[in-house]
């Protein structure tokens, strides 16, 4: 994917002036960043966007903070195992395009091949019992052996054991984060996150530097389910 397209999406999400579901709706209707950017301003006015939003959508925003953050993300993506996957990219998961609010761009750290596998979502409580965590670990191993890639949220409890079950069976796993790609939460999962980078991928839709705001976690769940052909919520007991 060319850097101009990535830069366009990065400026949009960094500005926080246009909700991601609205960006997604535009992409579903017009097909690409290029098609959206080339629409006449009057079309955006008819759709109810204000002047600042129209400037962003037309690619003419001059907001320095947004531009600087976007440039830092491009620099991040120039390093080994770091990727920016835009909506138009061949590496963008096809199932994720089908949801109403698919992210316009994904930050990926690890293996791109893991994005296009057959995923199964395995999630649950952070405050799970030993029994619940044991079940999550076992189910992750069995599903992995059956050819499915476990997708979860890197949280404590069930999510962590699901990732560990997949990794310990020698298979890849995908972790969808509720922070920027450059910040692991909880911090106690840094070693697990590194294992996932080496045998799967960390994924985030959020701008770099985004802290673990509580609202981020329900929001990222749509990506976990959107990536998967099926899902299972493991009870904490």
PLM feature segments, named:
Residues 1-88:
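Short, small/acidic-rich helices and loops at N termini and domain boundaries
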